[in-house]
A protein has these predicted regions:
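Membrane-anchoring alpha-helices and their flanking helix-loop junctions
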Residues: 1-132, 153-211
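Active-site-proximal inter-transmembrane loops
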Residues: 126-147
Length: 211
């Protein structure tokens, strides 16, 4: 196992990074909000999220920060959970898994931040009819970088911590099902342009052209 202090530092750093990105995402959406989005939100009350959906979103998006930072604090103080036999997950080559988890985190978090900025600026700040087909940054190569980031971050935290506390993050793997629900709506919205975009890009991994 990697030293508990190092694991705690990495958990705290990545947990705070995730949380700050969520806050920044909301800020970017508000900062770049178009006048038409503001007008539509005042007129359309049916599509406003309910308090229940807001609560679910808060739990889902807040869990990585709460669990990672909480476990990091435990590691800095008494290690009642981080190194405890009843909570640690014993695996062979544990250091290798933890290093892999760190690599996945530092791949997933920048991807998540980039996706949050781009969607906050160009997508969620506008009403659906005014949203461009986003093809900037990672969207040039894959269609769902944020969902890929969800899964990378979930695996990263679990492997880095090797602790039962982080296992609830497996819920983030449900992101793999979201594109199947969303892409038919995107085809309706963008038509042939989105179909052409599908041919050029992969859902989660880039497509490599031959020749």
């Amino acid at each position: 196992m990697l030293p508990a202090v190092l694991v705690s530092v990495l958990l705290a750093t990545c947990g705070v990074w995730w949380g700050l990105t969520i806050i920044a995402w909301i800020t970017w959406e508000k900062r770049f909000e178009s006048p038409t989005k503001s007008a539509d939100s005042l007129q359309d009350t049916e599509k406003k999220p309910t308090w229940k959906s807001k609560l679910v979103d808060a739990i889902e998006f807040g869990a990585p920060t709460v669990l990672a930072v909480g476990l990091a604090v435990d590691g800095f103080t008494g290690r009642a959970l981080l190194s405890a036999a009843g909570w640690s997950i014993p695996v062979p080559f544990s250091e290798g898994f933890q290093i892999l988890g760190t690599v996945l985190l530092f791949a997933g978090l920048p991807l998540f931040t980039a996706g949050a900025y781009l969607t906050g600026r160009y997508v969620y700040s506008r009403p659906p009819t005014d949203r461009p087909l986003l093809q900037k940054g990672p969207y040039r190569f894959i269609r769902h970088p944020i969902y890929l980031a969800f899964m990378l971050v979930a695996v990263g935290f679990i492997l880095l911590a090797l602790n039962l506390v982080m296992l609830p993050l497996v819920y983030m793997f449900t992101a793999i099902t979201y594109p199947k629900q969303e892409e038919p709506e995107l085809i309706k919205l963008y038509g042939g342009a989105y179909r052409e975009y599908q041919q050029r890009t992969g859902r989660f991994l880039p497509k490599f052209r031959r020749g």
